[in-house]
Curated annotation (Swiss-Prot):
Activity regulation: Inhibited by apstatin and the metal ion chelators EDTA and 1,10-phenanthroline. Partially inhibited by dithiothreitol. Not inhibited by enalaprilat or amastatin. Specifically inhibited by the pseudodipeptide CQ31. Inhibition by CQ31 indirectly activates the CARD8 inflammasome: dipeptide accumulation following PEPD inactivation weaky inhibit dipeptidyl peptidases DDP8 and DPP9, relieving DPP8- and/or DPP9-mediated inhibition of CARD8.
Binding site for a peptide: 77, 395, 489, 498, 523
Species for this entry: Homo sapiens (Human)
Free-text function comment from the UniProt entry: Metalloaminopeptidase that catalyzes the removal of a penultimate prolyl residue from the N-termini of peptides, such as Arg-Pro-Pro. Contributes to the degradation of bradykinin.
Compartments where located: Cytoplasm, Cytosol
PTM sites of type N6-acetyllysine: 304
Subunit structure: Homodimer.
Protein residues bound to Mn(2+) 1: 415, 426, 537
Example of a GO cellular component annotation carried by this entry: cytosol
Cofactor(s) it depends on: Mn(2+)
Gene responsible for this protein: XPNPEP1
UniProt-recorded name of the protein: Xaa-Pro aminopeptidase 1
GO molecular function: aminopeptidase activity; manganese ion binding; metalloaminopeptidase activity; protein homodimerization activity
Length: 623
């Protein structure tokens, strides 16, 4: 697929940068981040401004346009994809590589003296603004809020903002009512002497009110803001969806609730004006709590003396620690998901040798099998179905122009997941339908060793995820190999497939200590550009574990795999595994056979059951 031609769009954007209708004085650079007004990773079509301007549609990236240059910063997941999707107007800035300048350093190096750099304050996170403004100011430049989004001005056929119906979740799924969640939040606010809390992240609002939506594809969220006071609840949401009988009943809107649980509903776009009015009535010592990831427009509406900024909100942390109802729901969801994947892999083994299966048809088949499971709602992200060289594109999504046929000669990687009412799944398996080469087996085995090292790890309570990242890379590092993405991310409970604040990574989502009840992925990989990609991913639950000793009474933790899908033994160089690694894999496969076998039997899926039994035969080293 040829890259998008962007010359005319860039000309129009540069013209807008000088247009007095939009800016009081011309700006010399314009920043276009990935996110929306809620700093979401996955966004609605109406918010895909960076993709519209550049052609690059990966989930992470920041574009900066000056009079002379157009540059795109993205991370290692997207280097290959961005290079393919952008035309020659663009310079790709590969984040994480030592020779790549930061965005602010690059701007300082290319801008004329005393330049003005513009950005839409509603879609830029506060922490990003502060960092950028500080560096620019020290070099004699200025970061300017441009309230009219300049991309919107040149995007003539921009889609409408979605406003789809809401889904209510009962206690069987959530384990705790929305009123109790609000009460818990108010306790956290009182501990910090905070009167008000502004909620801007879409998944936090969905979690708090036990509601789900479908405004963003694959992410069960809805466009909204909330302001929680010690005695007030304000919800900012558009459309008549709040008037649906099930939603009114769920939120108790028609009942004469005690005042502190009565929800005041406001239009979505009135958040800044209502927040401004609220702040105007604050007494001198009253504080308003807001995430430093909230937009600059929201945080700047709160006067500095009243503003309390924190990296992670109490909702973010509470949401990450799943209660027993959520953990059980996630277990159920992963059992259903494993059934669908056993069906898929059995089907692929029969059909691939016939030569008619493509990356797209395999992805479609995976969705078809998932849709047969109870409480299926949607996929949790676009399926990464990739064979041969396409597997080396870490976040590859097949399109007709790139769609390869699966064969007996190439490694096949499928990274996929689903949203069920009781949980969110995300699983990657890499397999070969013919005979893998010795090098493919070698690389796969290094990745498997890393996967096992993380999954079997026992670590003290309070350990941060970044300390486990090297466990996953050690076998690869020993051979001079590595991968350019984190090892794991948090996973929501029928919410976003990527969630903070926990994870296993050398960078993102690794700041908060892991604690029992958190759910993360374990997904090391290896990618040979132009040849193949390998990744093995399970979703795992952090659980307590008893150890021989208990230093300082702090306790220990380990991981329970929730994903129960066989790992193809054909791809393993078994003699390179230790006895402990062989035991781990055999025990894992025994659990897959026991748990998923029962469900396959219950659903009458005999062929898939036979496939499961074949794929979970124990391995042993040739001594």
């Amino acid at each position: 697929m040829p890259p998008k031609v962007t010359s005319e769009l860039l000309r129009q954007l540069r013209q807008a940068m000088r247009n007095s209708e939009y800016v009081t004085e011309p700006i010399q650079a314009y920043i276009i981040p990935s996110g929306d007004a809620h700093q979401s990773e996955y966004i609605a079509p109406c918010d895909c401004r960076r993709a519209f301007v550049s052609g690059f549609d990966g989930s992470a990236g920041t574009a900066i346009i000056t009079e002379e240059h157009a540059a795109m910063w993205t991370d290692g997941r997207y280097f290959l994809q961005a290079a393919k999707q952008m035309d020659s107007n663009w310079t790709l800035m590969k984040m994480g590589l030592k020779d790549t300048p930061t965005q602010e350093d690059w701007l300082v190096s290319v801008l004329p003296e005393g330049s003005r750099v513009g950005v839409d304050p509603l879609i830029i996170p506060t922490d990003y603004w502060k960092k950028m403004a500080k560096v620019l100011r020290s070099a004699g430049h200025h970061l300017i809020p441009v309230k009219e989004n300049l991309v919107d001005k040149i995007w003539t056929d921009r889609p409408e903002r979605p406003c789809k119906p809401l889904l209510t979740l009962g206690l069987d799924y959530t384990g705790i009512s929305w009123k109790d969640k609000v009460a818990d939040l108010r306790l956290k606010m009182a501990e910090r002497n905070v009167m008000w809390f502004v909620v801007t992240a879409l998944d936090e609002i969905a979690w708090l009110f036990n509601l789900r939506g479908s405004d963003v594809e694959h992410n069960p969220v809805f466009f909204s803001y909330a302001i929680i006071g010690l005695e007030t609840i304000m919800l900012f949401i558009d459309g008549d969806r709040i008037d649906a009988p099930s939603v009114k009943e769920h939120l108790l809107l028609d009942l004469g609730l005690e005042a502190e649980y009565r929800i005041q509903v406001h239009p979505y776009k009135s958040i800044l004006s209502e927040l401004k009015a609220l702040c105007a009535d604050l007494s001198p010592r009253e504080k308003v709590w807001v995430s430093d990831k909230a937009s600059y427009a929201v945080s700047e509406t709160i006067p500095k003396d009243h503003r309390c900024c924190m990296p992670y909100t109490p909702i973010c942390i509470a949401k990450a620690v799943k209660n027993s109802a959520e953990s059980e729901g996630m277990r159920r969801a992963h059992i259903k998901d494993a059934v669908a994947l056993c069906e898929l892999f059995n089907w692929l083994e029969k059909e691939v040798p016939k030569g008619g299966v493509t990356e797209i048809s395999a992805a479609d088949k995976a969705e078809e099998f998932r849709r047969q499971q109870a409480d299926f709602v949607d996929l949790s992200f676009p399926t990464i179905s990739s064979t041969g060289p396409n597997g080396a594109i870490i976040h590859y999504a097949p399109v007709p122009e790139t769609n390869r046929t699966l064969s007996l000669d190439e490694v096949y990687l499928i990274d996929s997941g689903a949203q069920y009412k009781d949980g969110t799944t995300d699983v990657t398996r890499t397999m070969h339908f013919g005979t893998p080469t010795a090098y493919e087996k070698e690389c796969f085995t290094y990745v498997l060793k890393g996967h096992i090292a993380v999954s079997a790890a026992v670590f003290p309570t309070g350990t941060k995820g970044h300390l486990l990242d090297s466990f996953a890379r050690s076998a690869l590092w020993d051979s001079g190999l590595d991968y350019l993405h984190g090892t794991g991310h948090g996973v929501g409970s029928f919410l976003n497939v990527h969630e903070g604040p926990c994870g296993i990574s050398y960078k993102t989502f690794s700041d908060e200590p892991l604690e029992a009840g958190m759910i993360v992925t374990d997904e090391p990989g290896y990618y040979e550009d132009g040849a193949f990609g390998i990744r093995i991913e399970n979703v795992v639950l952090v659980v307590p574990v008893k150890t021989k000793y208990n230093f300082n009474n702090r306790g220990s933790l380990t991981f329970e795999p929730l994903t129960l899908v066989p790992i193809q033994t054909k791809m393993i160089d078994v003699d390179s595994l230790t006895d402990k690694e062989c035991d781990w894999l055999n025990n894992y496969h025994l659990t897959c056979r026991d748990v998923i076998g029962k469900e396959l039997q219950k659903q009458g899926r005999q062929e898939a059951l036979e496939w499961l039994i074949r794929e979970t035969q124990p391995i042993s080293k040739q001594h």
